C-alpha cells in the first residue's frame, strides 16, 4: 500500500451546496418579496465528495458502461454514511480534508480557542455545575459576543489564520423560472467561494499498490454545483497529520479533525462540548451514471468541534464508525492514549 498527498487547487470560484444554502420562499410569497433568492456555498467539500472524486479519477472505464470491470477497482457502490462495511477497491482510506500553503498544513482551529487569539489558546478555567444530565463543565472564557473561533490553525506552530484570509466570496446574479400559473422570472444571487493567498485543499489517500494514478501525478476534476474546475496532484508522502495535531492539543480535549456522524445522544456523554453542525444529504451515482438524491437528511458534527469526556468507551461507541472513517469522516484526535 502507498500513501499519497492529494492536493486540490480550484481554478475558478466553486460552489458546494447543502440543505441550508437554498433560502427559497414559498411561491405565494414570491410576488411580495420580488422573487428574490440567495444561495450560499459551503467553504469546503465534504469527505464523501472527495471519495467520489477519487473513485472517478481511478475508475478504468468512465462511461458507466462497464460496472463489472470498475467494481474491483473502485467498489460497486457510492459511499453511504450509514452503511457498515463498504469496499472501495484500491482506495483503502482517506484522511480528513485540510488546507495547505507553501508546505504548511492548516486545520480548523479547535472551537475551545479563546476568541481573537493569535495562536491556539484553549479554555483552561472550568467549573463544575449540576444539571439534569449530571455534572457538566462551564467556562467564563467563552465570550458569546465574539462567538466560536472562525480560523485555521497552522500545525507547525499553532498560529491561527482568520478564515477570511483563506476564503473569499464572489456573488453572481442570475434568474430562475418559477411556476405559479404564469411564466415569470425570479432573480437569485449565488455566493461562490474561492481560495485566497495561494491556499489549496489537501488530504491523504491510502491506495493499494495496484492503483493506477494519473500520468505524471496530475489530473483535473470538476466538483460541486456548476462543476467548477480543480487541478489535482498526487505525491507519495507519509501521513503525519494526526500526530501533528495531537502535539497542539491540551490533554483533556477530544478534537474533531473531520466532520463526525454520531449517534444523537453523544452530547449527553460529554462533560463539556463546543460544537457546530452541518447538514448532509448524499447524492448517489448509480452504475448507469444516473444520480439520485438520498431521502434522508443527516446532521454532522462539524470539524473543529471539541469534547471533554469522562467515559471514553461509551463515547467511542457513539462515534467510532469504521465505514465513515474509510472516507475520512469521524476522525477524533486526542492525547489520551499517549
Q: Where do the protein language model's features map onto the residues?
A:
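Conserved active-site/ligand-binding neighborhood in enzyme cores
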Residues: 1-338
Amino acid at each position: 500500500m502507498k500513501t499519497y498527498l492529494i492536493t486540490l487547487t480550484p481554478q475558478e470560484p466553486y460552489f458546494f451546496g447543502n440543505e441550508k444554502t437554498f433560502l427559497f420562499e414559498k411561491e405565494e410569497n414570491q410576488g411580495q418579496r420580488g422573487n428574490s433568492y440567495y444561495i450560499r456555498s459551503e467553504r469546503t467539500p465534504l469527505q464523501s465528495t472527495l471519495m467520489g472524486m477519487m473513485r472517478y479519477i481511478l475508475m478504468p472505464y468512465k462511461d458507466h458502461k462497464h460496472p463489472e470491470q470498475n467494481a474491483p477497482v473502485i467498489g460497486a457502490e457510492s459511499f453511504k454514511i450509514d452503511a457498515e462495511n463498504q469496499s472501495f477497491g484500491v482506495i483503502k482510506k482517506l484522511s480528513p480534508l485540510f488546507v495547505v500553503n507553501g508546505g504548511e498544513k492548516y486545520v480548523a482551529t479547535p472551537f475551545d480557542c479563546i476568541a481573537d487569539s493569535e495562536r491556539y489558546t484553549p479554555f483552561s478555567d472550568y467549573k463544575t455545575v449540576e444539571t439534569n444530565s449530571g455534572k457538566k463543565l462551564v467556562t467564563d472564557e467563552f465570550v458569546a459576543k465574539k462567538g466560536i473561533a472562525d480560523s485555521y490553525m497552522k500545525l507547525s506552530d499553532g498560529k491561527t489564520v482568520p478564515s477570511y484570509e483563506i476564503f473569499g466570496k464572489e456573488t453572481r446574479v442570475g434568474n430562475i423560472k418559477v411556476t405559479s400559473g404564469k411564466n415569470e422570472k425570479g432573480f437569485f444571487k449565488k455566493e461562490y467561494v474561492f481560495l485566497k493567498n495561494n491556499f489549496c485543499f489537501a488530504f491523504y489517500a491510502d491506495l493499494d499498490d495496484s492503483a493506477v494514478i494519473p500520468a505524471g501525478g496530475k489530473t483535473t476534476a470538476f466538483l460541486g454545483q456548476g462543476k467548477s474546475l480543480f487541478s489535482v496532484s498526487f505525491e507519495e508522502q507519509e501521513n503525519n497529520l494526526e500526530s501533528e495535531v495531537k502535539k497542539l492539543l491540551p490533554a483533556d480535549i477530544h478534537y474533531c479533525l473531520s466532520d463526525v456522524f454520531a449517534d444523537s445522544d453523544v452530547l449527553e456523554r460529554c462533560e463539556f462540548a463546543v460544537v457546530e453542525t452541518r447538514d448532509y444529504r448524499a447524492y448517489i451515482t448509480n452504475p448507469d451514471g444516473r444520480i439520485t438524491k438520498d431521502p434522508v437528511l443527516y446532521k454532522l458534527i462539524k470539524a473543529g468541534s471539541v469534547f471533554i469526556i469522562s467515559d471514553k468507551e461509551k463515547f467511542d461507541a457513539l462515534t467510532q464508525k469504521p465505514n465513515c472513517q474509510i472516507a475520512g469522516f469521524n476522525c477524533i484526535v486526542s492525547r489520551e492514549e499517549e
